[in-house]
């Protein structure tokens, strides 16, 4: 896996929009699509993830690795392309994700965890930790929002990648309750695919900055045993 990220290509940035126009049909995953995935999308996401995993492993007390999702499944191409930085020997479906996602119209990056069967242990630990550290969690989220990193509402599979920030639960005024209601934690920054920075190798630094801004929250909600 290359540690050299040279920026996203036009083929990569345009690919999800094309698939969206084709309604992600099985027929749209033809030989040309497979070649774009193999030669552009997959290696570019992989290289960006590996740069980020290496960098934040050096900057923090954690050891990270990259983990990329497939671009297709039995139903056809996936509604977005994504991968994540996860604990060494971890998995994107069971651990907190420091993720990168190419979703129609946007590149998104941030911290994600879902209340799912596979991630149940990580989810329960994260929510309980939030409840015990509500003020610290609120401080991190408030600070991150200054540079455009915000908690967002869940999206349906076919929705565009437009980030829709969420507000804290008005009754409890607690972020833990907000995320419990959403059944996921999704705190992110997004760039429109037309943004020139996406085509620049320095975009890796943008992603690393997002991950490091969220690292105080990661420390609060991650179970240290997953790094043992």
Language model features: what each stretch is:
Residues 16, 67, 134:
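Functionally constrained cores in energy, signaling, and assembly domains
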Residues 105-170:
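Compact, glycine/acidic-enriched structural inserts
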Residues 64-97:
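Amphipathic, interaction-prone secondary-structure segments
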Residues 89-131, 180-197:
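Intrinsically disordered, low-complexity regulatory segments enriched in Ser/Thr/Pro
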Residues 1-31, 35, 39-56, 154-228:
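Long, solvent-exposed, polar/charged low-complexity segments
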Residues 44-77:
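Glycine-rich, compositionally biased intrinsically disordered regions
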Residues 49, 57, 61, 120, ...:
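Solvent-exposed, non-transmembrane amphipathic alpha-helical segments
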Residues 57, 61, 76-78, 93, ...:
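A generic structural signal for short, non-catalytic loop/turn and secondary-structure boundary residues
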């Amino acid at each position: 896996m290359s540690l050299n990220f040279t920026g996203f290509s036009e083929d990569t940035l345009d690919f999800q929009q094309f698939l969206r126009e084709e309604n992600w049909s099985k027929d749209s995953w033809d030989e040309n699509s497979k070649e774009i995935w193999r030669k552009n999308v997959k290696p570019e996401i992989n290289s960006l993830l590996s740069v980020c995993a290496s960098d934040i492993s050096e900057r923090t007390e954690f050891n990270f690795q990259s983990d990329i999702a497939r671009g297709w499944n039995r139903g056809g191409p996936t509604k977005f392309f994504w991968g994540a930085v996860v604990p060494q020997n971890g998995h994107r479906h069971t651990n907190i994700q420091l993720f990168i996602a190419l979703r129609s119209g946007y590149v998104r990056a941030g911290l994600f965890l879902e209340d799912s069967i596979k991630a149940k242990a990580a989810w329960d630990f994260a929510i309980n930790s939030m409840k015990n550290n509500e003020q610290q969690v609120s401080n991190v989220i408030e600070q991150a929002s200054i540079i455009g990193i915000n908690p967002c509402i869940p999206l349906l599979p076919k929705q565009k990648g437009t980030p829709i920030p969420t507000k804290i639960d008005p009754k409890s005024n607690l972020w833990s309750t907000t995320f419990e209601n959403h059944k996921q934690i999704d705190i992110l920054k997004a760039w429109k695919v037309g943004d020139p920075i996406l085509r620049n190798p320095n975009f890796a630094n943008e992603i690393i900055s997002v991950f490091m801004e969220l690292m105080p929250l990661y420390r609060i909600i991650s179970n240290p045993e997953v790094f043992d």
